[in-house]
From Swiss-Prot:
Reaction(s) catalysed (UniProt annotation): (sulfur carrier)-H + L-cysteine = (sulfur carrier)-SH + L-alanine
Family: Belongs to the class-V pyridoxal-phosphate-dependent aminotransferase family. Csd subfamily.
Name of the featured protein: Probable cysteine desulfurase
Organism expressing this protein natively: Thermotoga maritima (strain ATCC 43589 / DSM 3109 / JCM 10099 / NBRC 100826 / MSB8)
Molecular function as annotated in GO: cysteine desulfurase activity; pyridoxal phosphate binding
Residues that bear N6-(pyridoxal phosphate)lysine: K223
Length: 413
């Protein structure tokens, strides 16, 4: 069971779905929010809200101070400098910012090679693919060769001699839960710009981009107890200084004349317009909550629940589970029940058992195609996905397993 304190921090856990207590297993999509985050949001709006970086009155100074202190806390968390922390609306915006700015600045040029893995969420796939049509750079794909979309080291090594300009890869698959060996990326691609999609990885462990040698790291706060509409892009200072801004407008400029524009210093030249001030400030409470809980404890708990779910789900006949099915699989269990569409499975789990899981292609259609190739069932180009976080328990896993068994029984009558 949850500790009383943790249970009280997440009021959503007290909900009932058709008389059943909610079992929230959709944290890979978005996490529940603790009371501390919501309280901070309310307090800031009532006591400190004003626009930032624009005025000298008391509220503006107070808001700007909290805003920049939040940036400093995220910089410390990532082992970076505040100038390397850019606030965005989420991982999708962060990645698009990096892609477009690399192109505008001429760092990524025609005939350069971009490597993208086939594990990617569309946010780290579509921008690279689509913009290659307009800018003439070449694109190649890192194809996973292991069990149901598992990326092996050899899959990376076979591309090392291609000298890619950019390597874009996730740190943890949002479909299979495979944790990629991000610590090895710089060794494999010593001269490449590496962009790491950390949307699923950072909520589970505090990766330090400088230590592992990546140039960009993108993630979203709503997947780690924070508000929606807040993302972080870490960018290596030496690269950011060369890059043209993604958006133009207020506060990202130094001087504007009739002839040209000069830009503000880092990180502000990448933060045009009024930012999502209150949600960014409240996101600091989410980070603090996780730090106080302890990321080692967060990681260990999620790992235990994942391995328990894998072990028990593998005992159910007619259930196909995707991913490596070993210690590399973390936080996510994607599966299908033979002969039953995942949308039907998810709907029944919700209505009959109070279980919230995701069903669909999870914004990863290229990976779905790979799963279909290896599937032993009539693969529906989608899966059910159960994902775990700090507020889940072993009892939640047991309810999920029993729910899947019941769904299978009902459809076999």
């Amino acid at each position: 069971m949850l500790s009383t304190g943790l249970y009280e921090d997440f009021p959503t856990l007290k909900m009932k779905i058709n008389g059943k207590r909610i079992v929230y297993l959709d944290s890979a999509a978005t996490t529940l929010k603790p009371k501390q985050v919501v309280k901070k949001l309310e307090e800031f709006y009532y006591n400190s809200y004003a626009n930032v970086h624009r005025a000298v009155h008391t509220l503006a100074v107070r808001a700007t101070t909290e805003f920049e202190e939040t940036r400093e806390e995220f910089a410390e968390f990532l082992g970076a400098s505040p100038e390397e922390i850019i606030f965005t609306s989420g991982t999708t915006m962060a990645i698009n910012l990096a892609v477009v700015s690399l192109l505008r600045s001429g760092i990524l040029k025609e005939d350069d090679l971009v490597l993208v893995s086939l594990l990617e969420h569309h946010a780290n796939f579509v921008p690279w693919l689509r913009l290659s049509k307009f800018h003439g750079y070449r694109i190649d794909f890192i194809r996973p060769s292991g069990r149901f979309g598992t990326l092996e080291m050899d899959d990376l090594l076979k591309h090392r001699d291609k000298n890619p300009k950019v390597v874009a890869i996730t740190g943890l698959s949002n479909v299979t839960g495979q944790r990629i060996p991000v610590e090895e990326l710089r060794n494999v691609f010593p001269n490449s710009i590496i962009l790491l999609d950390g949307a699923q990885l950072i909520p589970h462990e505090p990766v330090k981009p400088k230590e592992i040698g990546v140039d960009f790291l993108a993630f979203s706060l709503h997947k780690m107890l924070g508000p929606t509409g807040v993302g972080v892009l870490y960018g290596k200072r030496e690269v950011l200084e060369q890059m043209e801004p993604f958006l133009y407008g207020g506060e990202m400029i130094d001087r504007v004349s009739l002839e040209d524009v000069t830009f503000n210093e880092l990180p502000y030249k990448f933060e045009a317009g009024t930012p999502n001030i209150a949600d960014i400030v409240a996101s600091r409470e989410a980070l603090r909550y996780l730090k106080e809980t302890g990321f080692d404890s967060v990681h260990e708990k999620i790992e235990q629940l994942t391995q328990m779910a894998l072990k028990e789900m593998m005992k159910i006949g007619g259930v196909e589970i995707y991913g490596p099915l070993d210690e590399r699989q973390h936080g996510i269990v994607s599966f299908n029940v033979k002969g039953i569409h995942p949308h039907d499975v998810a709907h029944i789990l919700d209505q009959e058992f109070g279980i919230a899981v995701r069903s669909g292609h999870h914004c990863a259609q290229p990976l779905m195609s790979i799963l279909k190739e290896q599937s032993q069932i009539d693969f529906p180009n989608s899966t059910c996905r159960a994902s775990f976080y700090i507020y889940n328990t072993e009892e939640d896993v047991k309810i999920l397993v029993e729910g899947v068994k019941k769904v299978k029984e009902w459809f076999s009558r």
